[in-house]
Amino acid sequence: MFRRLLIATVVGILAAFAVAGFRHAMLLLEWLFLNNDSGSLVNAATNLSPWRRLLTPALGGLAAGLLLMGWQKFTQQRPHAPTDYMEALQTDGQFDYAASLVKSLASLLVVTSGSAIGREGAMILLAALAASCFAQRFTPRQEWKLWIACGAAAGMAAAYRAPLAGSLFIAEVLFGTMMLASLGPVIISAVVALLVSNLINHSDALLYSVQLSVTVQARDYALIISTGVLAGLCGPLLLTLMNACHRGFVSLKLAPPWQLALGGLIVGLLSLFTPAVWGNGYSTVQSFLTAPPLLMIIAGIFLCKLCAVLASSGSGAPGGVFTPTLFIGLAIGMLYGRSLGLWFPDGEEITLLLGLTGMATLLAATTHAPIMSTLMICEMTGEYQLLPGLLIACVIASVISRTLHRDSIYRQHTAQHS
């Protein structure tokens, strides 16, 4: 047992450095090509001229597509093993390391050029790759899946500053394939990754700063649960839209570079209306949580951002949709809260409360992982007073979504790329 905990610690350290490496590479490219040192792609887009704002995501998608197509032609074969940590966990615990690194580099290109795709997907993949590389060198084959799971959980902890949620995400996704005893190393890796990441970044701040002064009352629990029902209906709709957009792009029968460029061009066009469509949505989420906008502003940004996410994911841009899903959930919750706020004197607090609830419940509805979703929002914001209500709402959202749409966002993604 001591041996496993020691390896879990090493995996956590490796994962933290993998995530930090990707983050610093992203910041470097943003500084070189966008003259942006704020770390916010929305700020970068705001400061660009309209023609650069239009073309930059398209050029980034084109470059990523050329890289992926060039690698496939160079090797003259498709990847001989998984290039996704979820697939590796569901098969024999091995990666195609070279193809996975190329995929991560392609993700770096589309992320830094403004596509509405999550950067954390590549971060978690790199963390899992580092764990897998170490495991194949120093551990027996039957443990490889465990250490990939530890690496993925550690990557999520370092990226989202949510070690418990990262650990439970792995446990919920792998329910039935991992023994409960295996959670120990997973949690150790996640916590170590968070601590090392804090040391690297010289900060232990929460991912999102929220000033929620409301004390949750019976009325608020009713509103939280009703938001869970709404998210349970919206989750399957979002997954259906993503699948339809993916099939639409595939039906065009474009070469990968042009397909990714088209997705980027759509994001560029939308950014002419609002630069908030650039990036994974992190900075927009923070601005909404700091000062919830008016109903029509939320609705406008929501529609543009939703279309940008659908275009980016549908075109096959390498990256995650975890953080974009958080923004969509926040917007849905805030739209609902703003509508209800017309009849309540504390409309601002209700809007913020239901925005946080929307983040958790839509995440639960799309991942079918309610416990992870609840803990993730609490860990990212520090609002642990919401935990009981969020847990009930997330379970309801997950049950409704699973009834209407059997596959989670991860199973759907695997099916699309298999």
From Swiss-Prot:
Membrane topology classification: Multi-pass membrane protein
Keyword Signal found: no
Function: Probably acts as an electrical shunt for an outwardly-directed proton pump that is linked to amino acid decarboxylation, as part of the extreme acid resistance (XAR) response.
Segments on the Periplasmic face: 26-53, 167-177, 243-257, 312-315, 373-379
Membrane-side (Cytoplasmic) residue stretches: 1-4, 75-145, 201-221, 279-290, 337-351, 401-418
Major subcellular site: membrane
An example Gene Ontology biological process: response to acidic pH
GO cellular component, one term: plasma membrane
UniProt xrefs under PANTHER family: CHLORIDE CHANNEL PROTEIN CLC-E (PTHR43427:SF6)
Record key words, sorted: Cell inner membrane, Cell membrane, Chloride, Chloride channel, Ion channel, Ion transport, Membrane, Transmembrane, Transmembrane helix, Transport, Voltage-gated channel
Gene3D superfamilies: Clc chloride channel
Protein name per its UniProtKB record: Voltage-gated ClC-type chloride channel ClcB
HAMAP family documented for this protein: CLC_ClcB (MF_01203)
Region forming the signal peptide: none
Subcellular localization: Cell inner membrane
Membrane-traversing stretches: 5-25, 54-74, 146-166, 178-200, 222-242, 258-278, 291-311, 316-336, 352-372, 380-400
Record-level Gene Ontology MF annotations: voltage-gated chloride channel activity
Similarity comment: Belongs to the chloride channel (TC 2.A.49) family. ClcB subfamily.
